[in-house]
């Protein structure tokens, strides 16, 4: 039976793979789906976000125990030393459809997104990124900690402590062209109340597949190919899992709900384009920090992501839309603007 939550109710809410104490600030109906404005205890209001019910748990002893178990698991994972050797795996296809070979041993680590685990192998000799990707890039080059303006709760009572989540340990170097594009994207949607037409063509999956074809012939051996395939498959997984939870601006959520109803059996990577994918790289360093991936796997993944971003810049005319759509009046009334 679905649980409904009330304003000011104390709850637990998933942010990444961990549960945090939070309270319900506001509620809103999007079609037949209830969304909740969440304020995380101890976090500034810039971190408030609209979430659906599947990210919220009731404040119960059982769920508090789950919160503690998840936290302890994350701590033990970070303290665990990287294994230098791993047993040979048997030939099989993993859940992403990418074949792994039993003819060799390789290091691997598990990436968990919203409860689903997927393996990514680790590799060495990758380059670290040099500059952080801002959570919101302004035209003057400065950054803002929030992705769009959020409604502050009327009750501005102080929490027991004022603390924001730590900055990600890892960084993704985003080309300036894409940083400026993110700014324009934010303005078009949140200020101009425009939308990107969905379904998009080419899609996220198509863009990643095209990059794969351009890259794979330059890899040196079968192991490098396998690592690259796993990394690209992982990127698709992250996008599918994160889109509805953290990649949409409030003005887009109604469109997202309509798309889900219209295409119930289609993955989001086959409907959305790179315009939404590049938003993922704002939050990806933080998400990666919370996985149990070893440092070699992380550096390998980030290296391929940065190459992919450079590829998108070279082919920006092919992958990025030229014009946004004006939202019709009935859509604006549904959104409440």
From Swiss-Prot:
GO terms for cellular component: NuA4 histone acetyltransferase complex; nucleus; Rpd3S complex. Residues 166-336 form the MRG domain. The keyword Transcription applies. Belongs to the MRG family. PROSITE patterns: MRG (PS51640). Residues 137-158 have a biased composition (Basic and acidic residues). One of its GO terms (biological process) is transcription initiation-coupled chromatin remodeling. Component of the NuA4 histone acetyltransferase complex which is involved in transcriptional activation of selected genes principally by acetylation of nucleosomal histone H4 and H2A. The NuA4 complex is also involved in DNA repair. Also involved in deacetylation of histones, chromatin assembly and chromosome segregation. May act as a transcriptional oscillator, directing histone deacetylases to specific chromosomal domains. Residues 70-169 are annotated as: Disordered. This is Chromatin modification-related protein eaf3. Its main location: nucleus. Signal peptide: none annotated. Disulfide bonds: none annotated. Component of the NuA4 histone acetyltransferase complex. Heterotetramer of alp13, clr6, prw1 and pst2. It comes from Schizosaccharomyces pombe (strain 972 / ATCC 24843) (Fission yeast). InterPro entries: Chromo-like_dom_sf (IPR016197), Chromo/chromo_shadow_dom (IPR000953), MRG (IPR008676), MRG_C_sf (IPR038217), MRG_dom (IPR026541), MSL3_chromo-like (IPR053820).
